[in-house]
Structure formats: structure tokens, C-alpha cells
């Protein structure tokens, strides 16, 4: 079966963000997200109005990739960046925890993430969602690039080959 690590990350995150926006009512951006920057190291707020959904999808993928409990501090470090301080040397800052924490809480309400003593882990529903999205992306990529058909599961591969007329 196709996993979320076997497809391009940008395609997975974009598709997952669109799915979250349309189908998961528990995940909604707070009103302050229109004005907030994603860190003190940024000069302006994000230009994409759907950045909340993209960040939620990205967090889901990071939890999937880790395969172990991940804490808020680790996610803050992952989303952190370097701040230009004028004449002073650049310095690395962590991302603010409020947005990440609220997204994790919303993902918990949607039952895509579970909270454990060591941190947050992906729930079976969350893992299934990411794997399903990865499978759909691989099917789309296979239509564009037929050489990727070898990565499809055997039954789907046969169906694809019979439909396309390739033997």
C-alpha cells in the first residue's frame, strides 16, 4: 500500500489542506489569523488566506513522518526560522506556540491526533486519512507519468493497465 512518505510532500499537503477545509468542521481558523504573523522572524502575515489549513496538513504529515510522540516544543523548532536583526548577527527563533497548539487541539477534536504523556501522536483515523490521500495522489501522478504504475498495489495496477490498454 502507498504511504504518505512515498508521494511528493507539497502535493500531499495541498490535497490534505483542501480536504480538511471542506470536510472537517472541527478545524477552523480563529479570527486573529488574518492579522497574525507565523513567527517573530517574519515581516508580514501569510499571503495565503488558507494558511491555517496548510499548517494543519503539514503538522499531520510531520506527525506521520515522526512515527513517535512529538511535543509542542519540537514542532515550534520545526516551524521556526532565522530572524534578520539589522546590523546584529542573525539568530534562530522558535515559532510561536499558540497557533500550533490550537491546531493540535482542533486535530484532537477531529480525532486525527491523540494526546499521550510523551506528546501528540497520529491516531489510526489520521494515519488512514493520510494514506488515502497519498493513494489518490499516486493515482493522479500515474495518469501523468505511466512509469509510476509499478508503485500501485497489484489489483489497482491491473485495473489501471486494463483501462489504459497497456499490457
Regions found by a protein language model. Give the residues of each.
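A short, conserved structural fragment
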Residues: 104-118
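Short acidic, hydrophobic short linear motifs in intrinsically disordered regions
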Residues: 69-91
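Short, amphipathic alpha-helical interaction segments positioned at domain boundaries
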Residues: 124-167
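Eukaryotic partner-binding/assembly regions in large regulatory complexes
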Residues: 1-42, 46
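Short, hydrophobic-biased segments on the C-terminal half of alpha helices
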Residues: 72, 101-105
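Short conserved catalytic/interaction loops centered on acidic-Pro-aromatic/His motifs
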Residues: 86-90, 114-120
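Short alpha-helical segments that sit at the start of domains
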Residues: 27-77
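Basic, low-complexity intrinsically disordered segments
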Residues: 98
Amino acid at each position: 500500500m502507498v504511504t504518505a512518505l512515498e508521494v511528493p510532500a507539497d502535493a500531499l499537503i495541498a490535497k490534505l489542506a483542501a480536504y480538511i477545509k471542506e470536510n472537517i468542521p472541527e478545524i477552523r481558523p480563529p479570527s486573529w489569523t488574518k492579522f497574525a504573523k507565523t513567527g517573530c522572524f517574519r515581516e508580514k502575515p501569510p499571503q495565503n488566506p488558507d494558511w491555517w489549513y496548510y499548517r494543519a496538513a503539514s503538522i499531520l504529515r510531520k506527525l506521520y513522518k515522526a512515527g513517535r510522540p512529538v511535543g509542542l516544543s519540537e514542532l515550534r523548532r520545526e516551524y521556526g526560522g532565522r530572524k534578520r536583526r539589522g546590523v546584529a548577527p542573525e539568530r534562530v527563533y522558535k515559532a510561536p506556540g499558540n497557533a500550533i497548539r490550537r491546531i493540535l487541539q482542533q486535530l484532537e477534536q477531529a480525532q486525527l491526533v491523540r494526546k499521550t504523556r510523551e506528546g501528540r501522536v497520529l491516531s489510526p483515523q489520521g494515519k488512514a486519512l493520510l494514506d488515502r490521500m497519498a493513494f489518490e495522489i499516486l493515482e493522479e501522478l500515474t495518469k501523468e507519468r505511466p512509469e509510476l504504475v509499478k508503485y500501485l498495489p497489484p489489483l489497482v495496477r491491473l485495473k489501471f493497465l486494463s483501462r489504459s490498454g497497456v499490457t
